């Protein structure tokens, strides 16, 4: 069972690398102007489905999610041409909110405990 997890992790890594190259080259939707970053990929143990977590700069996340999920079957076939797997998992794109969450926490911490440059000068 331990080998199964290692294999799914390797496949997830490979899918992440390949999709990072395929998406900017293959998706020609004019609504997709922002830079899409694949932050994580989680592959099911049976390799039937893959959740693709992404972030995007300067774009509406719901629009980009719809674009990517609409192009999922095309991206799956493009992925199948570039990797050697018996079956390529179905792709499900999910916006990764962890980056925004981290930035929000950082802002809250800075509000509560603002960095004080004058105390550094006095020491």
From Swiss-Prot:
InterPro entries: KH_dom-like_a/b, RbfA, RbfA_dom_sf, Ribosome-bd_factorA_CS. It is found in: Cytoplasm. GO terms for cellular component: cytosol. Keywords: Cytoplasm, Ribosome biogenesis. GO terms for molecular function: ribosomal small subunit binding. GO terms for biological process: maturation of SSU-rRNA. It comes from the Bacteria. The keyword Cytoplasm applies. The keyword Cytoplasm applies. Pfam families: RBFA (PF02033). Disulfide bonds: none annotated. Monomer. Binds 30S ribosomal subunits, but not 50S ribosomal subunits or 70S ribosomes. Belongs to the RbfA family. One of several proteins that assist in the late maturation steps of the functional core of the 30S ribosomal subunit. Associates with free 30S ribosomal subunits (but not with 30S subunits that are part of 70S ribosomes or polysomes). Required for efficient processing of 16S rRNA. May interact with the 5'-terminal helix region of 16S rRNA. This is Ribosome-binding factor A. The gene is rbfA.
